[in-house]
UniProtKB/Swiss-Prot annotation:
GO terms for cellular component: cytosolic large ribosomal subunit. The keyword Ribonucleoprotein applies. Gene3D superfamilies: Ribosomal protein L13. PANTHER family: LARGE RIBOSOMAL SUBUNIT PROTEIN UL13M, RIBOSOMAL PROTEIN L13. This is Large ribosomal subunit protein uL13. Part of the 50S ribosomal subunit. GO terms for biological process: negative regulation of translation; translation. It comes from Delftia acidovorans (strain DSM 14801 / SPH-1).
Length: 142
């Protein structure tokens, strides 16, 4: 018997919804990254996208432990000299709810074409509403 290798056409992608209210950022991000890669499935194959679609609601209510609310800093650069800007977690959540979670998950996924395809299956919304009810996502508790 040879090792099973999944083909892209035979992979079934399911939809899950996660309520991030009062959940810790890193714990949610690590579970989401695992499910986006498909490592929770028996048919996991490293070179095939076997992961599921994840919808996260209430991302604006995510928490971080300790003093990371002010200490965790996100950097970005405009490309111009002296164009680096820093934003802490509290300000990032206030201005762009969910972007901190997207950055955390993206850092946990592989870099390259397969990782870029995986991050596209993550849908993050700051509020309780999402436009993916037609896909009938199952509730996932973390």
């Amino acid at each position: 018997m040879s090792t099973f290798s999944a083909k892209p056409a035979e992979v079934q992608h399911e939809w899950f919804v996660i309520d991030a209210t009062d959940k810790v950022l890193g714990r949610v991000a690590s579970e989401v990254a695992l499910r986006l890669r498909g490592k929770h499935k028996a048919i996991y194959t490293p070179h095939v996208d076997t992961g599921d679609f994840i919808v996260i609601i209430n991302a604006s209510k995510l928490k971080v432990t300790g003093t990371k609310n002010l200490d965790k800093v996100y950097y970005r650069h405009s490309g111009f000299p002296g164009g680096i800007t820093a934003t802490n977690f509290r300000d990032m959540q206030a201005k762009f709810p969910g972007r901190a979670l997207e950055k955390a998950v993206k850092g946990m996924l592989p870099k390259g074409p397969l990782g870029y395809a995986m991050i596209k299956k993550l849908k993050v919304y700051g509020g309780a509403e999402h436009p993916h009810t037609a896909q009938q996502p199952k509730a996932l508790e973390i």
